[in-house]
Amino acid sequence: MSDITGTAFPQVAPGGVPDWSAMKAEDLLAYREAENRRRSSPQARAITGEPDPGATIEWQEVALPDRDLPVRVYRPVGADRADLPLVLHVHGGGFVGTAVQCDWVNSHLAAQLPALVVSVEHRLLAPDTPLSAAAADGWDALQHMLQHAAQWGIDPARTAVFGESCGALISALSAIRARDAGLHLRAQVLVNPAVDVTETMFDHASITQHADTPTLAVPQLRLFHRLAVPPGADARALSPLYADDLNGLAPALVVLPTDDPVADHGRRYAERLQAAGTPVRLAEYPETGHAFLSMPGLVPQAKAAGAEILEFLREALTA
């Protein structure tokens, strides 16, 4: 999903917003390029927040067997250590988005935990890259980091995953795969998670209650769904909400803005985690919308949520 605001677009619906239902592939690519330039601009910092000066930020590439995967790396200033905890982050924005939009929270976590925070610049949804490709990016990055822990200066025994929106879906899937592979994660943080991409995605009550919010609307979700699960894709396998077994997963913090179309996705997932015996904390932030964590300049509650995430990870990664 995406926190889309204020970018001109060639096809607009009444009210001046993008006409998601009429969007063609070439239109989406043009919009994506323009929107990600805006999110990466210095001017956007007034909304997305200033990075913590206690962390360095740089782009690197993870060399996977079949592709090079860009990642944005946040490291504590002066941390010449080989045993930092790892927080693997996956940004939101199903078909629009960039790790840069999360510099504020990720740099703060890196500086204050301290930890190495790595944000995966996953393949955004498009006709040729469905959700399964982005999910593979998240999982492959996690495996690579743990297999090359010395190269990255991390302690693989102190690892957490952290995702926002569709990035939370990717992080939740990675947590499930990690358990199945015998990898022990310390924590998972899921912020406004969209964890159902089956046909029931639109049946949750919050979809109707918050169908047209400034940062996410149902027409966007329908476009997301069309790109995420093309004909022949296994939507259930990509939906953590319907995973067969949620027992034995890393303890979870689920952060929910209440005024969000997918708020009930997070509520139902927290209920399923609890029923399965996985420790879970559900933190709801009243009168906040989708993607609020990436907008501390506009939404004061973002800083409170960031502080809660910091304390949750600090407890998990230092125990």
What are these regions (language model features)?
Residues 176-232:
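Hydrolase active-site cap/lid region
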Residues 299-319:
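Catalytic active-site module of serine/aspartate enzymes centered on a nucleophile-bearing elbow/loop
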Residues 254-256:
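Short beta-strand/loop motif that positions the catalytic acidic residue
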Residues 83-93:
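Short beta-strand element of the alpha/beta-hydrolase
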Residues 99, 118-158, 296-302:
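Catalytic nucleophile-loop/oxyanion-hole region of alpha/beta-hydrolase
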Residues 163, 167, 171:
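Gly/Ala-rich beta-loop-alpha elbow adjacent to hydrolase catalytic centers
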Residues 100-119:
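Short amphipathic alpha-helix adjacent to the substrate-entry channel of hydrolases
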Residues 1-76, 318-319:
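A glycine/proline-hinged amphipathic helix-loop "lid/cap" segment
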